[in-house]
């Protein structure tokens, strides 16, 4: 039963009545205070709840935008970076962008390589900041290259590779003072190691270099002097025992090679066996090589024809129109260095002294000849490396 606050017993003195009234008033004040505190607590709890969900929403929105930025970067690196900067997810500084690329979370390593290889002044600054994030102190050159080449995928263009490997050589020499006479020596040896890796571990390369040949190839590159034989032997053994782990992103290495070909299309190829038959093949011209496939959807080519040291000419053929040939100038009987995959999956050397090919139309024949001629005459990567090698070999130590 609720107490009636208005009831006053009749036997109380005036003083007791006053005391009772004071107690009752204080009680009402306390009840009002308690209610006010309850209301305040409820309000604060509500605010905390709203604040939590607002923060959560903000984080979710931010994560969504970062994911979108990564996707954009993987499709178009410059647009992706621009999007992240515009949405305050990345600072517009070479250091911040380099850190983002170095962490590489969710990023396609081919896209990282393309961005770092650009020749814009800002991209070059990002490249140097990116290389600075790598710690190469006390690593031998193969160990440093393993770390570096895993952080992105080297692009195909010679000038881009040159800039990136130059930055690597500078950083390696900075971390390991005194190992090489100059950054040029480090640069040339780095390429020698990358090419050694290909020669030793590519099944299409039949002639595997020995350690003696590797040492001989690198004579005189240390500003005119030789590098210690033990160093070269160690580097050779390291690569022989464990090939470089190259980022693949989307399928195998070759898939990437065929993304931006110089030219592609259906052609007829005359077989090199005893019975000469014409076979329809899908040809792709890229990276100074002519690849041919049975179907456009095949990931692995049926054959590879390196264009180095070859020439091209138009020819007449009694059976097929619009023909041209690949051949070795001044040596008509020499077999062209090439390889093909047999039906059982074995990779064998080709046996052609010439490759005769027929195009569907005269226009396509002209276009193929023009593109192949351009590929044969242009090999800036090897020209660039040869020039650097000549420079370090001819330098005399003072």
Curated annotation (Swiss-Prot):
Record-level Gene Ontology MF annotations: guanyl-nucleotide exchange factor activity; lipid binding
GO terms, biological process: establishment of epithelial cell polarity; regulation of ARF protein signal transduction; regulation of cell adhesion; vesicle-mediated transport
CC annotations in GO: adherens junction; bicellular tight junction; cytoplasm; cytoplasmic side of plasma membrane; cytosol; Golgi membrane; plasma membrane
Claim: Cytoplasm is one of the keywords in the record: yes
Residues annotated with N-acetylmethionine modification: 1
Membrane-spanning ranges: none
Tissue specificity comment: Ubiquitous.
CDD domains xref list: PH_GRP1-like, Sec7
Coiled coil: 10-67
Membrane topology of the entry: Peripheral membrane protein
Domain comment as written in the entry: Binds via its PH domain to the inositol head group of phosphatidylinositol 3,4,5-trisphosphate. Autoinhibited by its C-terminal basic region.
Summary of the function given for this chain in its UniProt record: Promotes guanine-nucleotide exchange on ARF1, ARF5 and ARF6. Promotes the activation of ARF factors through replacement of GDP with GTP. Plays an important role in membrane trafficking, during junctional remodeling and epithelial polarization, through regulation of ARF6 activity.
The protein, known as: Cytohesin-1
Origin species: Homo sapiens
């Amino acid at each position: 039963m609720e107490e009636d606050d208005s009831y006053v017993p009749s036997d109380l003195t005036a003083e007791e009545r006053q005391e009772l009234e004071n107690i009752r008033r204080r009680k009402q004040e306390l009840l009002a205070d308690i209610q006010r505190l309850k209301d305040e607590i409820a309000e604060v709890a509500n605010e905390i709840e709203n604040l939590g969900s607002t923060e959560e929403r903000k984080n979710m929105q931010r994560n969504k935008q970062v994911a979108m930025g990564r996707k954009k970067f993987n499709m178009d690196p410059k647009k992706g970076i621009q999007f992240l900067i515009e949405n305050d997810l990345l600072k517009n500084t070479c250091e911040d962008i380099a850190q983002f690329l170095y962490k590489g979370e969710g990023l396609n390593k081919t896209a990282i390589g393309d961005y770092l290889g650009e020749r814009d002044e800002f991209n070059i600054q990002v490249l140097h900041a990116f290389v600075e994030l790598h710690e190469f102190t006390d690593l031998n050159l193969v160990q440093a290259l393993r770390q570096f080449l895993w952080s992105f995928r080297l692009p195909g263009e010679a000038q881009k590779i040159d800039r990136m490997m130059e930055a690597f050589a500078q950083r390696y020499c900075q971390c390991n003072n005194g190992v090489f006479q100059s950054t040029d020596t480090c640069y040339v040896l780095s390429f020698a190691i990358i090419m050694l890796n290909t020669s030793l571990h590519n099944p299409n390369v039949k002639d595997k270099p020995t350690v003696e040949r590797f040492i001989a190839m690198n004579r005189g590159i240390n500003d005119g002097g030789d590098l210690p034989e033990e160093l070269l032997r160690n580097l050779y053994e390291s690569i022989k025992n464990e090939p470089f782990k190259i980022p693949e992103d989307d399928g195998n290495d070759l898939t990437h090679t065929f993304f931006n070909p110089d030219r592609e299309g259906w052609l007829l190829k005359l077989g090199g066996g005893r019975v000469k038959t014409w076979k329809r093949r899908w040809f792709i011209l890229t990276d100074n090589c002519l690849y041919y496939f049975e179907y456009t959807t095949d990931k692995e080519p049926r054959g590879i024809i390196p264009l180095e040291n070859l020439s091209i000419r138009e020819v007449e053929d009694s059976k097929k129109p619009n023909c041209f040939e690949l051949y070795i100038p001044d040596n008509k009987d020499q077999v062209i260095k090439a390889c093909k995959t047999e039906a059982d999956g074995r990779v064998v050397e080709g046996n052609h002294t010439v490759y005769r090919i027929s195009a569907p139309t005269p226009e396509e024949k002209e276009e193929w000849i023009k593109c192949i001629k351009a590929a044969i005459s242009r090999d800036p990567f090897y020209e660039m490396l040869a020039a650097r090698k000549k420079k370090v070999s001819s330098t005399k130590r003072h």
